[in-house]
């Protein structure tokens, strides 16, 4: 390799393999994070600063929110969190992603009380959905989309992979028999159930965070983003849905649009009013010098390093914290009320209330250091050909508009 390889990190940046292997926990969920960073880069290109990302693959669906061009980073991320499991707290900077077990390979099944469920168990890629003809016998979301003709069998994987409608219907038959409905209706029920699960995730990342989805543009990616995106956007009253070119590999493209990034955290609990400003400034100075030393070792000049400061604040007595931006340079006494007011606003945004009269404290001081690197040039694609030349054929598709 002519250039040194880098690893994608869960904080939305990249690092050398040597740096990444020192703290491997920083690579958790780094693949999906690439899609979020790609969506932010795409938004900058097309002048869309408010974006909801939705990445639907074979096993899971993941969503994140970009507000005013800023990707939300959290230290409260919990691995494998779901309604029945609290998850494993990572306590490292991670792009804020909500993940559910709903993807193309998610298996449709009937629970003990006779209710239709989709996921989280997945058929994966091997044997995969029944329609693959590789031995899978259980009905999946992909089988349902094929039965509803929302997937074109002639164009699956560019026409290189043949899928079987008969095998999909055979797998869906037990679901239809259980509810005494036809197979096509059962397939639509599977799709609706999966869409409802996905909608819950989208609401968690937007409405539950205090954001109105109608103020955002949706970017659908992954192998199933274009299949389910239109229905999800319609339910959320999102006016614009963008499907990037080659959505299945969009996360990889997003990785190419990242800078080097290092996150530093110093835990130091002290009240906002009457805090030791000399100590606070020393903490940030120490972290900045450490970052510069790391990047200098990697051949990055100080002129190409950009710092972003923040702090995790909370009302005294609280367990959870809220990240709040802190201005660069030496922090003075007159800066503290500004930081406190920003914290109150952020807390109200996240939890719908703030306690302006309550005492607040710093819990962590954070520094993000970006090392600027060259990125691919994005070329404008000019329209060519005629609409007639783009015609591929016709088929009847069940969109269930009346259901």
Can you say where each PLM-predicted feature lies in the sequence?
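Flexible, glycine-rich phosphate/dinucleotide-binding loops
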Residues: 14-16, 72, 250
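Conserved phosphate-binding catalytic cores of ATP/NTP-utilizing and phosphoryl-transfer enzymes
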Residues: 1, 13-51, 78-95, 103-105, ...
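Short, hinge-like loop/turn segments at secondary-structure boundaries
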Residues: 23-25, 69-73, 258-262
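C-terminal, non-catalytic interaction/recognition modules in large multi-subunit enzymes and RNPs
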Residues: 48, 58, 66, 103, ...
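Gly/Ser/Thr-rich active-site cleft segment
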Residues: 1-16, 20-25, 29-32, 126-174
